[in-house]
Amino acid sequence: MDNQKGALFPDEVILQILARLPVKSLFRFKSVCKSWYRLPSDKYFTSLFNQLSVKEQLLVAEVSDSSSLICVDNLRGVSELSLDFVRDRVRIRVSSNGLLCCSSIPEKGVYYVCNPSTREYRKLPKSRERPVTRFYPDGEATLVGLACDLSKNKFNVVLAGYHRSFGQRPDGSFICLVFDSESNKWRKFVSVLEECSFTHMSKNQVVFVNGMLHWLMSGLCYILALDVEHDVWRKISLPDEIRIGNGGGNRVYLLESDGFLSVIQLSDVWMKIWKMSEYETETWSVVDSISLRCIKGLVPGIFPICQTGEYVFLATHKQVLVYQRRSKLWKEMFSVKGSSSLPLWFSAHAFRSTIVPCN
């Protein structure tokens, strides 16, 4: 920081204040002085900023009649985010620690990783997979994952699915392509996995914790996890109450909760939040049970999108709701005006506002 006589606050206090600003405001203040201009690229400051920002979860969603995304913040309300800087028509596939992985709409097989807060992006090189080998059944990867490691300022993109050679039946091989941001290269490994199936929401809600990417299997068999450093797949058990009862007719969703793996179980009248308190032993515990009686009419079409220990964001066809866990109050944060072709929950993702380079 620039030393100035008569400064009101010590440098560290100023850094703590600046680290709590939205990224947009922080970049606006770069013109104040040289030291503030350098902050977004300063390792100490970006680490401090990211440590604070990961404690908050935002919700981003595409609105069908708008070219921008809505961004819903528990404290600051609703704002807009644009992906126009990517210079392609894209759709969000997954989110991780402030980065979004998007696929090109006009050109199949083209992927981008971008940070909408800093408006930086990287177009990923195409893998060297031969065109005679393709993902089954529709030519696209079954799973898309993004693992953003804030401690190392790096990310991995994962494309995985069953492959078949052209003109042949699938042979059961589960192919995984992993992009490494440091080497700017793809690597490939092949596993033998029993046939896995996933819902639209379980593909959207990919959770990166403990160096692993996690997807919830449809049928509530287990959670499929990938160690992105060692290229190893692992199966993680769900809570016995969910697994043995096959969900008991309830809907179950996989989320993160303050760095822990979490599942949310929805019945007609209750929302039960589970947290994996011990990862290695796969120990689950119930941390909250929330009555849904006051939003009973919305329950059949409501989906939890993201959460912290303080609140839960949920989306319906046309609304975004927040539940405050301490006060036990519900609040509508956003509502689509007029008709909407796609439901909000279909394109809603957890998001964080971080300073992570992606180019």
From Swiss-Prot:
Transmembrane segments: none annotated. Pfam families: b-prop_At3g26010-like, F-box. The keyword Membrane does not apply. CDD domains: F-box_AtFBW1-like (cd22157). Signal peptide: none annotated. Pathway: Protein modification; protein ubiquitination. Keywords: Ubl conjugation pathway. It comes from the Eukaryota. InterPro entries: At3g26010-like_b-prop, F-box-assoc_interact_dom, F-box-like_dom_sf, F-box_dom, SCF_F-box_component. GO terms for biological process: protein ubiquitination. Residues 3-52 form the F-box domain. The keyword Lipid biosynthesis does not apply. The F-box is necessary for the interaction with ASK proteins. Part of a SCF (SKP1-cullin-F-box) protein ligase complex. Interacts with SKP1A, SKP1B, ASK11, ASK12, ASK13 and ASK14. This is F-box protein At5g49610.
